[in-house]
Every structure is written in structure tokens, then in C-alpha cells.
Design a protein with these regions (language model features):
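...captures the hydrophobic TM-helix bundle architecture rather than a specific catalytic motif
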Residues: 1-262
Length: 262
């Protein structure tokens, strides 16, 4: 009786994955730096593989705790929501830094960019071509993920799965269009401030889209296994929050960099 749980909190068991993922991120960061400076890519790909494996194992344990061990009580879910809110807030500040850098150099161009913005040797993208299509794709994906959420709340499992499926497809389509745009760009990320800021801002957003697509794909796989109910679905709710955040960031990127900046 002394070991009986008398509270609603989850005292997590020791896990190797936090420290493993931390070191994997270090390998990924160092590998990326070497790739940018020396065009040596194996370290970056090794770090990425290590991070993906660690994330898979870590989230697998979290799913087991939630679905099979019953550790995610209503009190625990409240704190999960607090945590996700703080995480998204930190991501907002991350993008604020890149918007700040962009507007600082574009509103006050110096001699390094020829005192004009965009620089004269830069051929900007037509905002009403692929960028507009990507905007419509993400707006539509925001609608489909909301449809999935409402279907789950109404216990419509079929609508939930259909909405998630469409959202994942749209996220993948956005990434393909972004890759196509990068491939046909007339400038790269090195050599001038325009390319650096453009690729860091839109590239990190693209990375977030990939992460969000994987997040939602995992939710889709879990949904097909019968996971998530209208009263217990924070895993999907967190993915939906993250996806809406990605949508909003893209609207600002589209307006600031593609439309105004062109």
C-alpha cells in the first residue's frame, strides 16, 4: 500500500532519450556547419539520422505512457498544454529574430547591399507564382486539420482520418513546391545578406513544415490504430496547434519577403 499512487501527476521513469537526442542534435549542428563551410555532408546526415531515431524512440515511450499505462491524467494533460504553449512561444521569438534581421537590412540598406533593397544583382521570386500556390496550400491544410479536429470531437472517426490524410498530403505538396522553388533560385545562401536571410527564414519555416507533416503523419498512423478519443487527444491537438502556427508564420513570410520584399 505504501507504493500506491495517491496523486494525479506522472513521475516519469529514467529514460536515455533526452541525453541521446541532445548529443544527436550536437552532432547534427556540427555536421551542418562543416557542410556549409567544407561541403562535407556525411556528418549532417549522420546527425539527422541519430535525431530521427531518438525522436522515434522517445515519442514511442510517450505513446505507451499515454495509451497503455494511463499516466496522462487530466492534470498531466493540462501541463502538457502549458508546455506546448511555451514551446510555440519560443518558436515565435525564433522567427521574430529573422524578421527583425530582414526588416533591419531592407528598411535601412547599407553599402554592403548597394544602398538599395532588394540588391540590384538579386532576381526575386514572383510572389504570385509558386509562393501564392504554397500560401493557398497551407491555408487549405489549416482547414483540413480543423475539419479533422472537429470530426474527432464529434466522434466521427472516418472524417478525422480523412482530414488528417488530406493535411499530410498538402504538407508534403508544400515541401515539394518549396524544393522546386529553391532549385530554380538564381541566388544561394552564401555571399550576400539577402540570400542568407531569405533561406534562413523560409528554410527554417520549411523545416518546421516537414516536422509538422511528420507529426501529423504519426497522428494519422495512431488514429488508424484507434488512438485518440474526443476526451483524450492531446497528441493530435498539439500537432494541430503546431500546424496552425506554421500557417501563420508563412502568411507573414509571404507578405513580408515575397510580396513587399519583391
Amino acid at each position: 500500500m505504501s507504493a500506491e499512487k495517491k496523486h494525479d501527476y506522472h513521475l516519469v521513469d529514467p529514460s536515455p532519450w533526452p541525453i541521446y537526442v541532445s548529443f544527436s542534435c550536437l552532432v547534427l549542428a556540427i555536421g551542418t556547419i562543416f557542410y556549409m563551410h567544407n561541403d562535407v555532408s556525411w556528418g549532417m546526415y549522420l546527425g539527422l539520422a541519430l535525431v530521427l531515431y531518438g525522436a522515434y524512440m522517445w515519442f514511442r515511450d510517450v505513446v505507451i505512457e499515454a495509451e497503455h499505462q494511463g499516466h496522462h491524467t487530466p492534470v498531466v494533460q493540462i501541463h502538457h498544454r502549458y508546455g506546448m504553449t511555451l514551446f510555440i512561444a519560443s518558436e515565435v521569438m525564433f522567427f521574430v529574430a529573422w524578421f527583425w534581421a530582414y526588416f533591419d537590412i531592407s528598411l535601412f540598406p547599407n553599402e554592403f547591399v548597394g544602398n538599395v533593397w532588394p540588391p540590384k544583382d538579386i532576381e526575386t521570386f514572383d510572389p504570385w507564382d509558386i509562393p501564392l500556390i504554397n500560401t493557398l496550400v497551407l491555408l487549405l491544410s489549416g482547414t483540413t486539420v480543423t475539419w479533422a479536429h472537429h470530426s474527432l470531437i464529434e466522434s466521427d472517426r472516418k472524417g478525422f482520418i480523412q482530414g488528417l490524410t488530406l493535411t499530410v498530403i498538402l504538407g508534403f505538396f508544400f515541401t515539394l513546391l518549396q524544393a522546386y522553388e529553391y532549385h530554380h533560385a538564381t541566388f544561394d545562401y552564401s555571399g550576400h545578406i539577402y540570400g542568407a536571410v531569405f533561406y534562413m527564414a523560409t528554410g527554417f519555416h520549411g523545416f518546421h513544415v516537414i516536422i509538422g507533416t511528420i507529426f501529423l503523419a504519426v497522428c494519422l498512423a495512431r488514429a488508424k490504430k484507434g488512438h485518440f478519443t474526443k476526451d483524450h487527444h492531446f497528441g493530435f491537438e498539439a500537432a494541430a496547434w503546431y500546424w496552425h502556427f506554421v500557417d501563420v508564420v508563412w502568411l507573414f513570410l509571404f507578405a513580408a519577403i515575397y510580396v513587399w520584399g519583391s
